Each structure stands twice: as C-alpha cells, then as structure tokens.
A protein has these predicted regions:
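Membrane-interfacial amphipathic/re-entrant helices at transmembrane-helix boundaries
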Residues: 1-22, 30, 34, 48, ...
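Hydrophobic core segments of alpha-helical transmembrane domains in multi-pass membrane transport
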Residues: 21, 46-50, 114-118, 160-172, ...
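Alpha-helical transmembrane segments within multi-pass membrane transporters and channels
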Residues: 62-112, 265
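Loop-to-transmembrane alpha-helix initiation sites
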Residues: 103, 131-135, 155-161, 204, ...
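Transmembrane helix-bundle core of multi-pass membrane transporters
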Residues: 113-175, 280-285, 311-323
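Helix-loop-helix "hairpin" substructures at the membrane interface of multi-pass membrane proteins
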Residues: 152-231, 260
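Cytosolic-side transmembrane-helix boundaries in multi-pass membrane proteins
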Residues: 170, 188-196, 200-202, 275-323
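Transmembrane alpha-helical segments in multi-pass inner-membrane proteins
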Residues: 215, 225, 229-290
Length: 323
C-alpha cells in the first residue's frame, strides 16, 4: 500500500506533462497537421511561463515566499500561452500559408525551441522559483482530510485538474460540436470540406494555435510543478515532447483515452526510479512507452478500423487547385 501511495501521485503528476502535450498535438493532427515541433513548443511554453512567474516574484522583492497563488498561476498561464501561441503561429504560417513540409518545419521548430529555451532560461533570474513552485503546487484545501482517497485523487495542484478538464473539453468539441466536425472533415478530406464552404486555412490556424497553447503548458508545468522550479537544459523537456507524440498514437487520436494513457506512461516513467533494478533493466523499462506505442500502431494498422486510424490527410499540405 505504501508503494502505491508513493508511486501513484508521482505518476499522475508526470502524466500531466504527457496529457497536455498529447492533447495539443491531437487537436492539430485532427486538422491534418503532424506537428513534430511539439517538443520545441513545450520549450517556448517553459520560457513564457517562467517569465510570468518572474514578473510576479519581482512584485514581492525579497519575500518570494509571500507571493500570491492566484497571480503566480495566472501570470504563468498568460506568459506560457503567449509564447506557445507565437511558436504555433510560426509553424502555422510556414505549413498552412507557405505550404512548407510539415515534418521538416516541425523538426526545425523543435531544434529552435530547444536553443531558445536554453538561452533565455539562462538569462532569467530563478531566485525564488523554488518558493513559487511550492506555492503553485498547493493541493486542494480539503485533500488532507479525506485519507487515502484525498491523497490519491485530490492531493494535486490546479494544473493537474486543468489538464484533465482540457482533455475532456477537446474530446467533447471534436466529437459533439460543429467546429469539431469541421476540424475532423479537414483532416480526413480537405477537398470535400473546402467544397462545402469550410474555411480550411482559418480553422487550421485556430487548431494549431490552440493546440500549441495547450502543449506549451506541459513545459511550464514540468519546471514549476515537477522539478521544483529548477532548469538545467531543454533536453528533458523535449524528451517528454517526443513521448507526448507517441501517446497520441497509443491512444488512437482520442483525447479522452489520453487521460488513461498518460497515466500509464507516467507510471512506466516513474517505475524504474522507485524499484531496485539493474541498469540494463532500468533502460528496458524506459523503452516500454515506445514499445507499447509500436505494438498499438501495428495492431491498429492490421485491424483496419477507421475509428483507430490517423486522419487521412495527416501530414499533407492542402493545395486548393488540386481539388
């Protein structure tokens, strides 16, 4: 029981990074854009969120431990959203307006995002970030009074519940709303969508910008909520970005399934650090998220069911004259 009480909260916390990244990517892929720039966008989100936190800490001078919880969360969200949207705007301009190759553009954005984060995070004064992290990580006020249930389900910061709410909302929008139907139509057959009057470029821009803002939250969450406000380099954040891309495939492009899938990825990520195993076994366990993703990809490809396949126009630029 003690083992579960320790590993489940840690798995849920790191699962939030995967969930935010995969939800943002799924929204983009539903409109036909395979954005391999997700790791870079998460780096942009990290810088923006940390700048927001820094602005709040400046207000409190030498007493960062007294910083206001609401302001820290709000400024982190605003800063993260702005820079993540900027990264998404760069990607969408290149791939939607200029019709650049999506894979090349995404990889370039990931490389640029890593360098961008490493440079600007080295300039940001991180004094007080540990205090800000402690404040942001404040769990729900009544969690401690509900025993095991409170510790396993309610003992998390607001970002965890925000990530779940975002995933559920995106799933609902894609399945149950007119704009979601338009998104899916663009991803499956943009020629037909264009023929019935759907504004392809406009909706692609919207999905990419919103998806980027969601994915960017994963970066600032990792720094401020998982590693206590510290930052060494962008490589770890980018590794979570690649795992988020794998999670999209693992959960067959369904944000609601990503809630459970992200917990599994989080559990597999935490497991090697909580049990005593050899170095070789630890590395094998690190590979498991990728291995299970490959297995799922093989199974879905063999099954041939449309409901578990990627959007038909995924990764393809749309040229109206080809209609």
């Amino acid at each position: 029981m003690d083992f579960l009480l320790n590993i489940i909260p840690a798995a849920i916390t790191i699962a939030t990074v995967f969930l935010l990244g995969s939800t943002g990517e799924t929204l983009m892929e539903k409109t036909g854009h395979l954005n391999l720039g997700i790791p870079g966008i998460m780096c942009f989100g990290t810088v923006g969120g940390c700048l927001g936190v820094r602005l709040v800490l400046v207000m409190y001078g030498t007493n960062p431990e007294n910083a206001n919880y609401f302001l820290l969360v709000l400024f982190a969200l605003i800063g993260c959203s702005l820079l993540s949207a900027l990264a998404g705007l760069i990607y969408s301009f290149l791939t939607v307006s200029l019709k650049c190759n999506q894979n090349v553009t995404g990889l370039a954005l990931t490389t640029f995002g890593g360098g961008f984060a490493d440079y600007f995070m080295s300039l940001i004064n991180k004094d007080g970030f540990a205090d800000a992290s402690n404040i942001i990580n404040t769990p729900l006020p009544f969690a401690s009074s509900l025993g095991i249930f409170g510790k396993l389900v309610l003992n998390y910061n607001i970002f965890v519940y925000l990530a779940i709410a975002i995933a559920i909302t995106v799933s609902f929008v894609l399945k149950r709303t007119r704009v979601g139907l338009s998104f899916r139509a663009i991803g499956e057959n943009p020629q037909t969508a264009d023929a019935v009057g759907i504004n392809i470029s406009k909706l692609k821009y919207i999905s990419i910008l919103i998806g980027s803002m969601i994915a960017g939250l994963a970066g600032v969450f990792y720094v401020m909520c998982f590693v206590g406000g510290s930052y060494e380099n962008s490589s770890t954040i980018q590794s979570f970005g690649w795992l988020s891309l794998a999670l999209v495939i693992f959960t067959v492009w369904k944000p609601d399934l990503a809630i459970l899938g992200s917990f599994l990825f989080g559990f597999l990520f935490i497991l090697p650090n909580t049990i005593e195993v050899s170095f070789v076994v630890m590395k094998v366990l690190d590979l498991l998220p990728y291995l299970v993703t490959i297995i799922v990809l093989i199974i879905t490809s063999i099954s041939g069911k449309k409901s578990v396949q990627p959007p038909s126009a995924l990764g393809l630029a749309y040229f109206r004259e080809d209609r």
